[in-house]
Swiss-Prot record:
Signal sequence, start to end: 1-27
UniProt propeptide residues: 28-33
PANTHER family: KUNITZ-TYPE PROTEASE INHIBITOR 2 (PTHR47247:SF1)
Coiled coil: none
GO BP: envenomation resulting in negative regulation of voltage-gated potassium channel activity in another organism
Site residues (Reactive bond for trypsin), renumbered to this chain: K47, A48
Described function: Serine protease inhibitor that inhibits trypsin at a molar ratio of 1:1.
Protein name, as recorded: Kunitz-type U15-theraphotoxin-Hhn1p
Organism classification: Eukaryota, Metazoa, Ecdysozoa, Arthropoda, Chelicerata
């Protein structure tokens, strides 16, 4: 009875993996990584004032980052934002 349960669990996990794996490769991923350029701008949770750049869907735009939190759609320079997010 123990072997049957183990085999059932392995089969279940295998089917689960096969069913969910294509979702991991969906439109929110680019070149195998999450496409940060599609994330909204996020100032973060603190009150510092750091000049950063985010991609707004069309171009890179300056915003004030609070210094902590936020998301990965945040770049130190316009050039870094353009390099990552603007498709040539």
């Amino acid at each position: 009875m123990g072997i049957a349960r183990i085999l059932s669990a392995v089969l279940f996990l295998s089917v689960l993996f096969v069913v969910t794996f294509p979702t991991l490769l969906s439109a929110d991923h680019h070149d195998g990584r999450i496409d940060t350029c599609r994330l909204p701008s996020d100032r973060g949770r603190c009150k510092a004032s750091f000049e950063r750049w985010y991609f707004n869907g069309t171009t890179c735009t300056k915003f004030v980052y609070g210094g902590y939190g936020g998301n990965d759609n945040r770049f130190p320079t316009e050039k870094a934002c353009m390099k990552r997010c603007v498709k040539a």
